[in-house]
């Protein structure tokens, strides 16, 4: 631990540089301990948790995949995005927002309820290290995650967090603008009484009451570049223009996107349409198949993302009621997918 001596008690400037200062009873000798970025206004309302956990457990045994993943990513952009999450005005201090955000990622990857997540943080050393908790330190209870999610929804941070992580990946060269895949999937509602959700029909499956996640992903890496959440009955072509990123390259999509409005949006953003076509009376079947055949295997790559969500994360239905909470859950799934996908790409 670095030691710094001051001649007299002062207001530490380390609040501007990301460090916590502890003074002795005389105010002369102070120790400086790094901590995650947070604005000065809310810093006293949040707990400070022990980052020494990483050093303690590194000597105890081999690193886990979570340790590798944590070290690979730059968490500073997410920490800055979380600066507006306020702490408790009275009573017990709130948990650090970045630690809580990391805990929600763990809950997404391992399909954990709030109760299961709280228990896992108590028992699993790798989970503690990932979130920044020391070995013998107290961890959040179930209700803390409920309050934190409520704050994320109130402040509207789901999109900001997704963008912050995406910027971090882009700086590491993970997102290359050479092609874009677009698609959507229906996710069931938490309750048939959810008034923000809607029924969606499918020609080969039973109707589903829920929401629809619309995404755009990079053609080669499979990293998600944009995401939007709507009621399940929203048409894909309606949302497509808003999820197509700037300079998208070649844009691949299934027949649901065969519409003039999507073609115009692709061209306006500097891209080239590689959309599959619907059948028409004036279009011979052989010409239609010749157009669609080479596009089909490329377009279908995006379905691996939805497969991961639904099979690995068990994200077949929402946990919470309401569109705002559905958007948060979809963004968390997209962030969790991107982080794990980036880690696997680096290991390949």
What are these regions (language model features)?
Residues 249-250, 255-331:
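Helix-centered, glycine/charged polyanion-binding patches within enzymatic domains
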Residues 92, 119-122, 131-133, 140-269, ...:
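Polybasic low-complexity intrinsically disordered regions
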Residues 62-110, 144:
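Basic, short loop/linker segments at the boundary and entry of helix-turn-helix/winged-helix-like folds
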Residues 2, 6, 10-76, 80, ...:
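Charged, often Cys/His-bearing segments associated with DNA-binding zinc-finger transcription factors
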Residues 109, 123, 154, 249, ...:
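Short, well-ordered loop/turn and helix-capping segments at boundaries between secondary-structure elements
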Residues 90-98, 205, 321-329:
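Structural motif
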